[in-house]
Amino acid sequence: MNLIESIRRILKEETEGIDSFINQIDSRYKMSDELKEFITDFIKESDCKKIEFTGFKFQALGLALHDGVLINKLALNRGLDFLLFVIFHEIAHQYQFKKYGDTKMYECYIGDISVDEAAKFMKTTEEVADEYASRKFRELVKKNIINSNFVPPQMYKNVPLSQIRMMVDNYRKEMKSKDITSSEKISEYFYNMVKSEL
């Protein structure tokens, strides 16, 4: 690692909530120090600003926004292997935000691209996140950090583009009716849509 990379690592902001997040997983599944470090490093390197377990108003297992990640606390009950896949999938989106920026990631909802283009982009980002999460899981197995026969699901591979197109169109109409035109407002909209106070 060269000097510039070292300085960047030192100056990186800490991910808000990460210690509590890791502790909640550890209290449930008693992870090795090596696994805790692997998950923590993966999250921090994504530039994720905040991460937390919370109740969700509906069945989604996670939500990635430009300013953080929410994981449905029900995912804690699905087994460590599946939970890791969900975390890796949502953090993969943080890497996408890091690579493309929030303007590109949110243009599906408020951008000038067509609904078809938006649906294709969204399907691609979801499929890439699934594949990335699968690779991270296989890396854990290969490094003998965990011992598992878990086969990570490809949750978005078989979702028809027409279904994603309909979802994008509905979100666009909703955001237009609420005059949502910025990344901050999109993040607030989705945060309030999924987070339950229970």
Regions found by a protein language model. Name each.
Residues 26-47:
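Zn2+-dependent metallopeptidase catalytic core
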Residues 41-70:
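Catalytic zinc-binding patch centered on the HExxH motif and its immediate surroundings
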Residues 70-87:
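Short pre-active-site segment immediately N-terminal to the catalytic Zn-binding motif
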Residues 81, 97-130:
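Post-HEXXH active-site segment of zinc metalloproteases
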Residues 85-98:
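Active-site recognition of the HExxH zinc-binding catalytic motif
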Residues 115-126, 131-198:
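Long, well-structured alpha-helical subdomains associated
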